[in-house]
Amino acid sequence: MDRYGEKQQQQQMFASYVDASLLAASGEVQGERPRARRRRRRGARCVGGGGGGGEVDGGDPKKRRLSDEQVEMLELSFREERKLETGRKVHLASELGLDPKQVAVWFQNRRARHKSKLLEEEFSKLKHAHDAAILHKCHLENEVLRLKERLVVAEEEVRRLRSAAGSHTASGEGGDIMGLGGSGACVAGSPSSSFSTGTCQPPSFGGGDHLGDDDLVYVPEYGGYADNSVVEWFSLYGLI
């Protein structure tokens, strides 16, 4: 019985120890949770106050939104100087009632906007020049096509004129040869050679052709004889 009682007592002590440890752990956890909630609530209150812009932004006049006069003064200063020195920045901030850091940030943003504007203007100029170059290229290509067409037409006209000139020359030479053969012209070995019966053909007279008295030629005589050359010519053509 004593041993049984000791075991029960030990079990009770262990159970009480476990219960105490569990209660302590739960108490610590429960104690931390409200603190975390309170911190979150405080942060929410701070965020809410800053979001409204009434207390946080309104409390510090240097962090308020810039007025039109302040912006105009900053723009004038930016036109004079793109980047302010430290003394100039502090002096301008004191004149406008702003924080020097706020003035420095404004100038930094203004330089970035100015650079972006310059890049946009440069891009616009380059794009305009590129479009003009493409248009000029199209005009040149059209002009090249027109010149090629004119060249083809000119080459065809040259070929036509050459062929026409060649055919005209060939026909002219053939006509000259035929005219010489049918006209009965005399062909001599040299310009000073006399007439010969072998190379000259007398003109033919048809049956209707008749020589009258008026067609006869009187040949004067010299020393009882006529001119031998004239007589020879008339006798050649059967006139005497």
UniProtKB/Swiss-Prot annotation:
Gly residues biased stretches: 46-56
Main location: nucleus
Pfam families xref list: Homeodomain (PF00046)
Keyword Transcription: yes
Record field: compositional bias (Basic residues): 35-44
Places the protein is found: Nucleus
Keywords: Coiled coil, DNA-binding, Homeobox, Nucleus, Transcription, Transcription regulation
Keyword GTP-binding: no
Cross-referenced SMART domains: HOX (SM00389)
Residues forming coiled coils: 108-167
Gene Ontology biological process terms, A to Z: positive regulation of DNA-templated transcription
InterPro entries xrefs: HD (IPR001356), HDZip_class_I_plant (IPR045224), Homeobox_CS (IPR017970), Homeodomain-like_sf (IPR009057), HTH_motif (IPR000047)
Cited Gene3D superfamilies: Homeodomain-like (1.10.10.60)
Tissue expression summary: Expressed in roots, stems, leaf blades and panicles.
Ranges of the DNA-binding region feature: 59-118
Renumbered residue ranges of the record's region Disordered: 26-64
Matches recorded under SUPFAM superfamilies: Homeodomain-like
Gene Ontology MF terms in the entry: DNA-binding transcription factor activity, RNA polymerase II-specific; sequence-specific DNA binding
Gene Ontology, cellular component aspect: nucleus
UniProt cross-references to PANTHER family, sorted A to Z: HOMEOBOX-LEUCINE ZIPPER PROTEIN, HOMEOBOX-LEUCINE ZIPPER PROTEIN ATHB-40
Purpose of the protein: Probable transcription factor.
Family, similarity comment: Belongs to the HD-ZIP homeobox family. Class I subfamily.
Protein name, entry field: Homeobox-leucine zipper protein HOX14
Gene source species: Oryza sativa subsp. japonica
Encoding gene, per UniProt annotation: HOX14
